[in-house]
């Protein structure tokens, strides 16, 4: 009887641990998605400000803050890619398993995005518009390549995400 009780308790503990791990993974995925959406919102606000020399209802101060937020969101979401969040087969994430299969490439692209975001913030603070354009293009290239390589896209999402995937956030990017 004691063996049955031990086996039952072991099974129950294992099940509860697995359930908690699954919930933790789902929470991490949700935080990651919110971070990425926050980055995209800021990119969409920044792009017209950088692209057009018009008096928009958006100031350089807001542009610097958006660049700073992009950098911060990238820093905060950097650790939100543990293997336990590889739940694309359960349709809980659009991140493909390739992230974890070729992790070095993912880390390289992520680092490029972080560097571009940091340099973009500096260029905006210094009114260095040539480098603002360059770093916005670098950010677009890093994010666009990462999305094209590691994000599953459903046909229904194509219209919404085409500009994010192209990596061409401003018109002068090659």
What do the predicted segments below correspond to?
Residues 4-13:
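Sec-dependent N-terminal signal peptides
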Residues 14-18:
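N-terminal signal peptide c-region/cleavage motif recognized by signal peptidases
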